[in-house]
């Protein structure tokens, strides 16, 4: 049994996330976690809300609430929606937790002690209209690289280029919109990433199995232009982790907080500590996942994120870990994703464009969305959500292929043999061929899941469903029963066991439907089918079942048209 540590990029607290956020991190991470648990491995799956920095302050101000209250409220909202999508986190934490405060301050102290922190006096925009310094994300303007007119002072979300506020063309305050900005002096802490560049580059070079998307972004940031730059890790904000050198005050840093991108990844570790606290466990129970001197040397750590998060996870967070000179676990594999676009435009939380997670759940159950998003995951290039494609995929894959098989088999058995697994007959050549075919296809499915090739895994799973349908079509038990009822019983006995097999292997993608299939079969045996032949004998003759309700209903043309109009691209 392996030990798998899984973290998903933690979502900002500033509102409900859209489907592009979901498919770019949390959902594929959940798929992998569920699969690994299903194979019998020990899994720790951690996520949290990212509650500090400019997004939180701006969103709270817009909502007219104190930032602490806003974050507490939105954490519960995001936690509830995550549960609605059946995201199986072992813990869903908060970056504003006391654990993360202490751990962030600890890392800063360790970095300073090892000479990787520099105090820098810099010139920063001060808004006369707002009477305050403006951290990078409080400034908007036009990106000098791609011309996007809503770029932020730290990064352009359109082209992902890292920016300095002074790089922006026509900068303005994100608070008031005022262009009356002055450059004034202020002192900040910088993480000396350049001093760690050789270590980071050697570490990245050692990860020969990483996706091209991950390594290409990391190396671009390492080498493009002037190469890897030192990174400011403090901000002139009120809300955040107060700057301290470990447990001690940091002279000259009074009233400042750590930059959100410094403390947010540390929440992966802190969130695991929160898990221990919430479950009455000792520190040793979370440290065995994170400290290589306390049991984490055999852990495989996998991160999931959108491509815009890759630079921070391949450069800045590893620099924090390496520079601490402490035995913390570094990530083994980073699964990154391109963007999911929406009907000809971009999904965007800040711009309110696209279908958001709460809206999605209000019109269809989670499995419909999970299946479409994962089977169209933007792995090798950007992908696009369209209502026509969504309707087609749901109707063909879920309703026609899987749902239809479950319905036909259970209803036919009930009408001809009753609601028990029939005992007659024995498998023939056709059944043996099916078992061999399924064994081969299952191996292909497992290979894709192990490699986190999400779209390919979905295609292999669908192929497994199709194989069952093709068997039923060729075997035609509804015809055979007229001349050889014993043989028809053998076919249906296999088909009922096939439903259980599908429930087990489909669970990572469509957990609710899998649970419904198992419940209708009166079965609680979720063991992974190492041997397909044996797996198709788990339900013995005489075992009772119930005929389930429709597993997946079809989306009508009228519904599709209505939703397309209702979700025309802007959330109001």
From Swiss-Prot:
* Principal cellular location given in the protein's record: cytoplasm
Q: How does it assemble?
A: Monomer.
Mind listing the GO molecular function terms for this protein? ATP binding; metal ion binding; methionine-tRNA ligase activity
Provide the E.C. number(s) assigned to this enzyme. Answer: 6.1.1.10
Q: Kindly state the positions of the motif 'HIGH' region in this protein.
A: 11-21
Q: What is this protein called?
A: Methionine--tRNA ligase
Q: Which domain of life is it from?
A: Bacteria
Location in or out of the cell: Cytoplasm
| Catalytic reaction annotation | tRNA(Met) + L-methionine + ATP = L-methionyl-tRNA(Met) + AMP + diphosphate
Q: Which residues form a coiled coil?
A: none
The family database entries (Gene3D superfamilies) matched by this protein are listed as:
HUPs, Isoleucyl-tRNA Synthetase, Domain 1, Methionyl-tRNA synthetase, Zn-domain
Residues annotated as binding ATP are 349
Protein residues bound to Zn(2+): 143, 146, 156, 159
Q: Please give the GO cellular component terms listed in this UniProt entry.
A: aminoacyl-tRNA synthetase multienzyme complex; cytosol
- Give the signal peptide, or none: none
Under the heading InterPro entries, the entry gives: Anticodon_Met, Met-tRNA_ligase_1, Met-tRNA_synth, Methionyl/Leucyl_tRNA_Synth, MetRS_core, MetRS_Zn, Rossmann-like_a/b/a_fold, tRNAsynth_Ia_anticodon-bd
Cofactor list: Zn(2+)
Q: Does the keyword Protein biosynthesis apply?
A: yes
Tell me, in a sentence or two, what this protein's role is: Is required not only for elongation of protein synthesis but also for the initiation of all mRNA translation through initiator tRNA(fMet) aminoacylation.
> Which terms under GO biological process does the entry name?
methionyl-tRNA aminoacylation
Which keywords accompany this UniProt record? Aminoacyl-tRNA synthetase, ATP-binding, Cytoplasm, Ligase, Metal-binding, Nucleotide-binding, Protein biosynthesis, Zinc
């Amino acid at each position: 049994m392996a030990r798998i540590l899984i973290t998903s990029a933690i979502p900002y607290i500033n509102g409900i996330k859209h489907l592009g956020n979901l498919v770019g991190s949390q959902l594929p991470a959940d798929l992998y976690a569920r699969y690994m648990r299903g194979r019998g491995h020990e899994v720790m799956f951690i996520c949290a809300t990212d509650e500090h920095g400019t997004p939180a302050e701006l969103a709270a101000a817009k909502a007219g609430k104190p930032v602490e209250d806003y974050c507490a409220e939105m954490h519960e909202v995001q936690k509830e929606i995550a549960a609605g999508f059946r995201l199986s986190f072992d813990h869903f934490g908060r970056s504003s937790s006391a654990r993360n405060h202490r751990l962030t301050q600890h890392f800063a102290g360790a970095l300073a002690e090892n000479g990787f922190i520099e105090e820098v006096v810099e010139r920063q925009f001060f808004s006369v209209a707002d009477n305050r310094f403006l951290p990078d994300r409080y400034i908007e303007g036009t990106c000098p690289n791609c011309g996007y007119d809503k770029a932020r002072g730290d990064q352009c979300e359109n082209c992902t280029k890292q920016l300095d506020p002074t790089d922006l063309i026509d900068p303005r305050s994100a608070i008031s919109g005022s262009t009356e900005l002055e450059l004034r002096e202020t002192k900040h802490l910088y993480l000396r990433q350049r001093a760690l560049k050789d270590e980071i580059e050697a570490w990245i070079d050692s990860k020969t199995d990483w996706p091209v998307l991950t390594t290409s972004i990391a190396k671009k940031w390492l080498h493009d232009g002037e190469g890897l730059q030192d990174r400011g890790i403090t901000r002139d904000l009120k809300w955040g982790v107060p700057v301290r050198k470990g447990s001690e005050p940091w002279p000259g840093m009074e009233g400042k907080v750590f930059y959100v991108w410094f403390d947010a990844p540390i929440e992966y570790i802190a969130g695991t500590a929160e898990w221990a606290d919430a479950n009455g466990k000792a520190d040793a129970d979370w440290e065995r996942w994170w400290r290589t001197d306390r049991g984490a040397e055999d852990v495989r750590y996998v991160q999931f994120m959108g491509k815009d998060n890759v630079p921070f996870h391949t450069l800045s967070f590893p620099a924090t870990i390496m520079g601490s000179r402490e035995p913390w676990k570094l990530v083994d594999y980073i699964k990154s994703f391109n963007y999911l676009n929406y009907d000809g435009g971009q999904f965007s939380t800040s711009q309110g464009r696209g279908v958001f997670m709460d809206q999605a759940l209000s019109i269809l159950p989670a499995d419909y969305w999970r299946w479409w998003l994962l089977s169209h995951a933007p792995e090798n290039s950007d992908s696009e959500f369209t209502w026509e494609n969504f309707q087609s995929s749901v109707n063909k894959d879920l309703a026609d292929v899987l749902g239809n098989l479950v319905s036909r088999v259970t209803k036919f058995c009930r009408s001809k043999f009753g609601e028990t697994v029939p005992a007659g007959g024995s498998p023939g050549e056709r059944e043996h061929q099916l078992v061999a075919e399924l064994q081969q296809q299952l191996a292909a499915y497992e290979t894709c899941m192990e490699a986190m090739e999400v779209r390919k895994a979905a295609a292999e799973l669908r192929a497994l469903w199709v194989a069952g349908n093709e068997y039923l079509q060729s075997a035609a038990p509804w015809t055979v029963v007229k001349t050889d009822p014993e043989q028809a019983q053998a076919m249906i006995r296999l088909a009922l066991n096939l439903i259980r097999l599908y429930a087990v292997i489909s669970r990572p993608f469509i957990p609710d439907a899998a649970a419904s299939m198992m419940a209708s079969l009166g079965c609680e045996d979720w063991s992974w089918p190492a041997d397909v032949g044996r797996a198709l004998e788990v339900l013995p003759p005489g075992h009772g079942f119930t005929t389930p309700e429709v597993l997946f209903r079809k989306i009508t043309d009228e519904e599709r048209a209505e939703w397309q109009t209702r979700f025309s691209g802007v959330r109001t």
